[in-house]
């Protein structure tokens, strides 16, 4: 057997058949029992190697904990048809966009189905060009998040606390970039957990929208989108004007008045394909570069 991947309490090996795997499992468990007897007399030996899945095809990424494959046998049962399974990829994240999830799932499935580079790259080129031209489902580009006002509470070293929104919406603290209680600069402010405040993506979207009167602070959730620049918001720590590239609203329909940054979403195609391309030694820039045939030139 050849070990192809291992992580914490699991190991993946290359083996010809389920029968051979079952035989190997039995042999290994017997050897473990010989070397380490069950001296406590437990009903089951404390160390047991279990056979969970047999993949008809498996792809392993170069980053730890990433793999994808087609499972044909699981927990003692042959499946009616191979089941696609993946571990460690962002397509499983709830916070990811439907568009990005779809791209990664598609490229992973093509990979484990052993499609050629040309087949995979051609498919992704179309997805890239569709995104760049805006030929994508609008809702698939949107992210949804819960709104927690606590995440926007800031703390000065002197223990005074204030809302990041108050610092940029007329509160007396906006009069200077210092704490009104102790005089320390706002750059020394942290979150309640003691971390440095950051305003990117969803946080930037909510900051822009609340400051510009598009949302209130009493909401429980919001949706947001990366858009072409639409205005400015004030950074609560530095006091600088920041160009708004993300917008948050209550519903999908509220966002339709904005133009998505399609170049950004097109780049997501390359980003989501990267784990597979890295594993295969391919260049993701090939997704952008469409080769032309002689017929296309003339």
Regions found by a protein language model. Name each.
Residues 1-8, 13-298:
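DNA-dependent DNA polymerase catalytic subunits
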């Amino acid at each position: 057997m050849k070990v192809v991947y291992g992580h914490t309490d699991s190991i993946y090996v290359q083996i010809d058949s389920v029968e051979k795997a079952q035989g190997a499992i039995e042999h290994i468990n017997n050897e473990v029992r010989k070397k380490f007897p069950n001296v406590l007399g437990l009903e089951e030996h404390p160390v047991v190697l279990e056979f969970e899945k047999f993949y008809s095809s498996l792809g392993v990424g170069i980053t730890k904990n990433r793999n994808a494959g087609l499972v044909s046998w699981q927990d003692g049962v042959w499946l009616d048809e191979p089941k696609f399974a993946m571990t460690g990829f962002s397509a499983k994240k709830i916070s990811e966009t439907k568009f990005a999830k779809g791209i990664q799932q598609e490229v992973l499935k093509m990979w484990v189905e052993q499609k050629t580079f040309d087949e995979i790259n051609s498919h992704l080129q179309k997805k890239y060009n569709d995104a760049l031209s805006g030929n994508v489902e609008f809702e698939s580009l949107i992210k949804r998040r819960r709104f927690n006002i606590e995440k926007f509470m800031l703390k000065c070293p002197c223990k005074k606390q204030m809302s990041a929104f108050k610092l940029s919406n007329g509160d007396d603290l906006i009069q200077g970039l210092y704490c009104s209680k102790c005089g320390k600069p706002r750059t020394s402010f942290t979150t309640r957990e003691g971390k440095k405040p950051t305003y990117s993506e969803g946080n930037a979207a909510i900051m822009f929208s609340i400051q510009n009167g598009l949302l209130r602070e009493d909401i429980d959730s919001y949706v947001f989108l990366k858009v072409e620049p639409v205005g400015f918001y004030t950074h609560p720590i530095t006091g600088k004007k920041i160009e708004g590239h993300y917008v948050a609203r209550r519903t999908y329909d509220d966002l339709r008045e904005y133009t998505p940054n399609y170049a950004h979403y097109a780049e997501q195609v390359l980003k989501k394909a990267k784990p597979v391309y890295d594993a295969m030694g391919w260049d993701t820039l090939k997704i952008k570069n469409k080769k032309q045939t002689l017929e296309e030139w003339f």
